[in-house]
Amino acid sequence: MLVLGIESSCDETGLALYDTQRGLLAHALHSQIAMHRDYGGVVPELASRDHIRRALPLLEEVIAKSGARREDIDAIAFTQGPGLAGALLVGASIANALALAWNKPTVGIHHLEGHLLSPLLVAEPPPFPFVALLVSGGHTQLMRVTDVGVYETLGETLDDAAGEAFDKTAKLIGLGYPGGPEVSKLAETGTPGAVVLPRPMLHSGDLDFSFSGLKTAVLTQMKKFEAAQLSGDALARAKADLARGFVDAAVDVLVAKSLAALKKTKLKRLVVAGGVGANRQLRAALSAAAAKRGFDVHYPDLALCTDNGAMIALAGALRLARWPEQANVDYAFTVKPRWDLASLAR
């Protein structure tokens, strides 16, 4: 089965072709980071317009890279939610228009299920079951994954997502957009232990997260720097140490909760997915914990940590292989800007 995947939930337009026999044939991605940088964040209307401009050229690129023909495509998978309503509507409309023109079925995919399954695209994919740590700009969750469509929420953030905390911390420190990579880069130049920030809910006894207090602690430190009238090199060093303190605190919590989830489920495999899953400090800490405690940790390729069409094509192929009745052949569709991943559980 050859499936075309279309991702448009936020500020990346991604298309890909995935074959159930041959794997990922090709994928192409356009990021809108440069367009949104002057605004300090994603502007939904601009994002939607750009998806319209980019989708069809990316489709031609993917078809050319793969060597496949349009008539070879068996189905079209698209991100149905969660995400920005307008952006989702663009991707869904394009998917269903192509499907109608080509006489192909469609299937709507949960964006987070795509991330959840993205590590299956590597050369040696992890077998089921496993614990998944989903960490992105909008979501932070721990899930028990027994099979495709068999998900149990073990814990989730009670306020800010980890990626959101990274972005807000970057803004507080005065870094550019996108904030997550910038604060991580600055943290690598900071002195470990120079600034120690709280580890929210580290000892809460459950698997939930909270990052709003950590963000507030960063704001408090910045006010202290201002009161001390730091400037020049002294302020630059203080900001680097603060960034290091923030990243260390966030990573400590993510690692500790992941270890607790493995202990609770008695599983020996951890999958990490989502944009924050590309963070080098997080990967290093989890890999060190895995070596020490004897469990396996799996990540998607760095290029597939961000939103992408490959994960949507994969999820669509896996769903249609298991549940052919999910194929939509009447081309009526809805999008779901808010959509609980646990609601997919079968």
UniProtKB/Swiss-Prot annotation:
First-listed, main subcellular location of the protein, grouped into a coarse class: cytoplasm
Annotated positions binding Fe cation: H111, H115, D307
Keyword Metal-binding attributed: yes
GO BP terms in the entry: tRNA threonylcarbamoyladenosine modification
Molecular-function GO term, any one: iron ion binding
Disulfide bonds: none
Record's GO cellular component terms: cytoplasm
Catalytic activity: L-threonylcarbamoyladenylate + adenosine(37) in tRNA = N(6)-L-threonylcarbamoyladenosine(37) in tRNA + AMP + H(+)
Top-rank lineage group of the source organism: Bacteria
Family: Belongs to the KAE1 / TsaD family.
Name by which UniProt lists this protein: tRNA N6-adenosine threonylcarbamoyltransferase
Species assigned in the record: Burkholderia multivorans (strain ATCC 17616 / 249)
Taxonomic lineage: Bacteria, Pseudomonadati, Pseudomonadota, Betaproteobacteria, Burkholderiales
